[in-house]
Amino acid sequence: MGLVSKVVPLADLPAAARAYAEDICSCGPLAVQAIKQSVYRGGRMTLAEHLKYEQQLASEVFMSEDAHEGLAAFREKRKPRWKLR
């Protein structure tokens, strides 16, 4: 299920948590928002409902201006300029 992705010594935990958070923050905000919505609402749905909901969220994200910007930035080897649209 992927709930644990890394184990670090307790002394290294703050730095590892910050690095993980920075990695998430570098992703497209609409995609991160959709993932959070899926996790929060998914626990109250059947599997079939959740899969349909995820498909709807993914379609919205993939059709967004930010999705096109992310692909363009990747092709042009630059940081994306997110617009939240």
Model segments located where?
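Active-site-proximal glycine-rich helix-loop-beta segment
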Residues: 1-3, 78
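C-terminal long alpha-helix characteristic of the crotonase
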Residues: 4-52, 60, 65, 82-85
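Short acidic-aromatic low-complexity motifs
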Residues: 68-69
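Terminal low-complexity tails and localization/encapsulation signals of metabolic enzymes
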Residues: 72-85
